[in-house]
């Protein structure tokens, strides 16, 4: 049995480094979703806030207004598609999980919003923990004499924190 999954990305931002706002218009976003599914994607990651170096915060209500209609559209055409939400905001995560997302992709590793792990646990969802410490959010910089040690320590702490909320680290 092949466990390989094709993951599609849908950036709903004007300042995305990968697609420069191509999917701000909902009809373009829907066409892109249809195309990703036709090409075999079984997992779609949706984000409404860029996290490229020097990004600006997008308020929660704007993120929700962009993402919820997309989740509803995906679920209306294919219930089997796994949906992850790329957000650092627990309020966005909470509403998106209520509407059918099952995974939160938090580039900050849950360090931006102290309620994130609680929300993920409440929904028995999965979380992708990224590395974007606060000191790196405004510039693309990481200084370490031993990068592997630094990252291992960072992720060990995040995983331990997630486990204290009952989040299964084997998912």
Residue positions per predicted region:
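Glycine-rich beta-to-alpha transition loops that act as phosphate-gripper elements at the mouths
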Residues: 10-11, 83-91, 107-110
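Conserved beta-strand positions in the central sheet of alpha/beta enzyme cores
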Residues: 43-45, 84, 105-106, 128-129, ...
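Glycine-rich anion/phosphate-binding loops
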Residues: 18-37, 62-65, 109-114, 149-156
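Short beta-strand/loop segments at the ligand-binding rim of alpha/beta enzyme cores
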Residues: 5-6, 77-86, 102-103
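Glycine-rich, proline-tolerant flexible connector loops at the mouths of alpha/beta enzymes
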Residues: 16-18, 42-70, 74
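Conserved, mostly hydrophobic/aromatic
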Residues: 10, 36, 40, 44, ...
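Conserved anion-binding
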Residues: 12-16, 51-54, 93, 99, ...
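A structural motif
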Residues: 38-41, 80, 101, 124-125, ...
